[in-house]
């Protein structure tokens, strides 16, 4: 029960990221427009008082502000798409449901335009409809309902005379019906909920503000590993607290109030639940990265230095902390707990200093400049001394604890000598033992990248033993273990199944072959290899691929390809080395010895070959642009979690991989070069 609820909360948290991702663009427009209209910047740049520039600035402010004015409908659309696997039909259903619910509530409560003049009554003008103000929560509820309707009815069958309305066309019809029904209990219940939220936020924010901001920062940071922090901070940013703007409209939520106050150029009273991120993300975590680098073993410092520098810059500039936090979260939970405490104390410190800073994306330098320095409405410079103190604290604490407890942070891992001592033929036996033996295996499966095993007792699984046997990573989801052994995963699974059935009794009978992928590839005359797009679509960074095995580069480096037409082509001249039995992945080797894995979609192994048609055979020579696989893209979008297709270099070694700055691509477009 708990695991199911936890999984649903994770899905909701992930769905909230889509509408939240729009806010930085809106904030950028609003911040620049407001800054150009403000006296603080005009004092130093008098030429921006020019009428044309001021008109453009005014339009930018309006363009950014309209997004924040319509957050409820944006959240409704975004949550619907996020929970429905990206299908646009869910967004249409959400829009239909949103306007029907609001119109029905307004009519049921007999809300008139005159009543909108008193915002304390809880009414608002929503898309021109006088109705009950349900805010972002109302949008989230409608989005979740639209996604439920989509997932429930998208493939419904109807009698032939109603065939036009079958399938996805039925979803908006059901949404119209359910949202009409929902409006009545919402009209009755929501005022009580709103009064409760107001009472809670007033008591929390006005009576115990210091404790509230500390607990907010502390809990939000602790929830990041579970992906639930988006759910936690949403009420604080979009509902808790209220402020009346110049037009008499009640604005709710710390972030919305902050943006509205920046837009109107008034004294700031908001930002309590955002500003604590700046000292941590701009100063504290980069200092922690330095401590991790300096405590790495000498032979690993070059690699660790590159990783830590990249993660530290990402944290400093954008406020994205996960690449750095996940480098020590699992190996040193104590460090992460201390990090969470320091995060909460940062919120408390800036609150006590009476600062009012905010952001639209995260607490990085970019938001600090746009929404702190340029508006110049609060003593933003105090963040710098606080941040410098935090840098010292983070560096000293992290360095001391890493050395004291010998935490295996990046670059301090023990060498896995047992890898060399395990022959390929014995590997299936050893992996079975590491999984807890035959009796502990409930379900056994594999795809081209990983061994998927559902176990009876997770405590019997030797995770470190699996890594020592060559797994580049081990993921745990409940009692489901995923050990990343790369292309030989299916061979291991096949032999493990035969061992469990008694068909194999000794290592000499296994089929796993010796892995020679780590042997250096001799590139005698060819200095570099160009790799072209495997089809028509667009490119995303590997870090955005919705599968940790790929996004954390456990299989190797590369890119994510999002196909827009139903076909995969050869990215270079070479040979087909592997075609997985379910046809969802293909391995290639270039004429220069570069090995590439093209994994079509995420979790598509579960489709058992449906939607794929192989056009080549193993060991067949291919030329760049030659069709390799025909795919039913519509089927994949409907039945797979994602159609994002990782293109991975599996034998990069010490060679350098550079990426072309491209977005939309076709088979003739180069996407990366290895040399």
Swiss-Prot record:
Keywords noted in UniProt: Cell membrane, Kinase, Membrane, Phosphotransferase system, Sugar transport, Transferase, Transmembrane, Transmembrane helix, Transport
Main location: membrane
EC number per UniProt: 2.7.1.199
Keyword Acyltransferase: no
Highest taxon, organism lineage: Bacteria
Alphabetical list of InterPro entries matching this protein: Dup_hybrid_motif (IPR011055), Glu_permease_IIB (IPR036878), PTrfase_EIIB_Cys (IPR018113), PTS_EIIA_1_perm (IPR001127), PTS_EIIC (IPR003352), PTS_EIIC_1 (IPR013013), PTS_Glucose_EIICBA (IPR050429), PTS_IIB_1 (IPR001996)
Membrane-spanning ranges: 16-36, 59-79, 81-101, 126-146, 173-193, 199-219, 273-293, 303-323, 328-348, 355-375, 378-398
CDD domains according to UniProt: PTS_IIB_glc
Enzyme class, UniProt record, top EC level: transferase
Keyword Phosphoprotein attached: no
Family annotation (Pfam families): PTS_EIIA_1, PTS_EIIB, PTS_EIIC
Membrane topology of the entry: Multi-pass membrane protein
GO cellular component, one term: plasma membrane
Annotated ranges, domain PTS EIIC type-1: 3-414
Gene3D superfamilies per UniProt: Glucose Permease (Domain IIA), Glucose permease domain IIB
Active-site residues, Swiss-Prot/TrEMBL: 447 (phosphocysteine intermediate), 599 (tele-phosphohistidine intermediate)
Domain PTS EIIB type-1: 425-506
Catalytic activity: N(pros)-phospho-L-histidyl-[protein] + D-glucose(out) = D-glucose 6-phosphate(in) + L-histidyl-[protein]
An annotated GO BP: phosphoenolpyruvate-dependent sugar phosphotransferase system
Subcellular location: Cell membrane
GO MF annotation, one: protein-N(PI)-phosphohistidine-sugar phosphotransferase activity
NCBIfam families tied to this protein: EIIB_glc, PTBA, PTS-II-BC-glcB
Functional description taken from the UniProt entry: The phosphoenolpyruvate-dependent sugar phosphotransferase system (sugar PTS), a major carbohydrate active transport system, catalyzes the phosphorylation of incoming sugar substrates concomitantly with their translocation across the cell membrane. This system is involved in glucose transport.
Domain notes: The EIIC domain forms the PTS system translocation channel and contains the specific substrate-binding site. The EIIB domain is phosphorylated by phospho-EIIA on a cysteinyl or histidyl residue, depending on the transported sugar. Then, it transfers the phosphoryl group to the sugar substrate concomitantly with the sugar uptake processed by the EIIC domain.
This protein's name: PTS system glucose-specific EIICBA component
Species per Swiss-Prot/TrEMBL record: Staphylococcus haemolyticus (strain JCSC1435)
Chain's gene name: ptsG
